[in-house]
């Protein structure tokens, strides 16, 4: 009897799971800006930004660990063989990615940051094919990534002055964050085949979050909420973003090729633009036609990468 595919390995499951993740991650962009205001963090206070990030990911790790321990009716405790992948993932996925992201974002333009961030999806597919040799690169994957990147570039360049500055501690840090994120995507796919992906996600968040918190604290960072209740509600939601999205993403990478999952990441900046416009009133000058064309390009790239091969 033929074994049935896990739901997340089917095309409907893949699409639904990826879009849920992308919507959650897209909401993080406006939430970070709202969080800076609620916690009284100035634009160039790197120490407090890292402390804020560390608190978010520490809570995310605790939520995954406690939640899954209750659901499974046993402690979600890593075994000895899980320690190494947890440390490697926390180094790339949380510490490396978000150390550079939170510092670089305060010094880079939103336009250039979004475009660089979108390249993580292309880099993940390139790393999977050329560095880790977990899958092969083909014309469809390259074309799909190119269309997705074009869509993100279009929606970010519209209404801008067309300039694309670059400074090492700004866009350079965003690029370093992007490389770390792309590498972590490949590593999650590899480790999740032999280890519990949710366990890895929870513990690497906790380890990475504690490291970022320590760095921010030692640098002199402080958090001074202007209003307690909204600030607490926001940090809880941001922890939920990380806990749910990364746990689900790990499951998707465990049962699908990296290329099929990563190409959906081009939806992150699209959700980010739409939610920033809705929650922050940003991008008022962006034409609805431009957004629609960008969405079509991104969706076209996703379809090309996920198109079934002819028998």
Regions found by a protein language model. Name each.
Residues 2-8, 57, 156-157, 231, ...:
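C-terminal-most transmembrane helix of multi-pass membrane proteins
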Residues 28, 69-113, 117, 154, ...:
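Specific transmembrane alpha-helical segments of multi-pass solute transporters/efflux pumps
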């Amino acid at each position: 009897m033929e074994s049935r595919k896990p739901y997340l390995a089917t095309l409907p499951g893949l699409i639904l799971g990826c879009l849920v993740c992308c919507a959650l991650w897209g909401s993080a962009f406006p939430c970070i800006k709202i969080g800076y205001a609620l916690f009284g963090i100035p634009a160039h206070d790197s120490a407090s930004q890292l402390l804020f990030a560390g608190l978010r990911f520490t809570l995310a790790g605790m939520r995954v660990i406690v939640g899954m321990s209750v659901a499974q009716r046993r402690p979600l405790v890593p075994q000895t063989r899980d320690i190494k992948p947890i440390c490697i993932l926390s180094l790339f996925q949380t510490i490396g990615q978000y150390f550079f992201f939170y510092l670089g974002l305060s010094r880079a333009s939103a336009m250039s940051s979004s475009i660089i961030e979108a390249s993580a999806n292309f880099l993940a597919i390139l790393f999977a094919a050329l560095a880790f040799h977990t899958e092969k690169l083909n014309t469809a994957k390259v074309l799909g990534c190119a269309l997705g990147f074009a869509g993100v570039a279009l929606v970010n360049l519209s209404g801008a002055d067309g300039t694309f500055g670059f400074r090492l501690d700004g866009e350079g840090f965003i690029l370093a964050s992007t490389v770390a994120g792309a590498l972590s995507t490949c590593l999650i796919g590899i480790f999740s085949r032999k280890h519990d992906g949710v366990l890895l996600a929870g513990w690497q968040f906790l380890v990475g979050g504690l490291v970022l918190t320590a760095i921010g604290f030692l640098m002199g960072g402080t958090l001074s909420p202007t209003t307690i209740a909204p600030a607490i509600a926001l940090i809880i939601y941001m922890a939920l973003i990380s806990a749910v999205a990364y746990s689900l993403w790990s499951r998707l990478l465990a049962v699908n090729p990296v290329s099929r999952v990563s190409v959906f990441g081009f939806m992150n900046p699209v959700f980010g633009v739409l939610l920033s416009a809705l929650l922050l009133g940003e991008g008022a000058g962006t034409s609805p036609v431009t957004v629609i064309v960008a969405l079509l390009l991104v969706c076209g790239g996703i379809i090309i990468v996920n198109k079934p091969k002819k028998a």
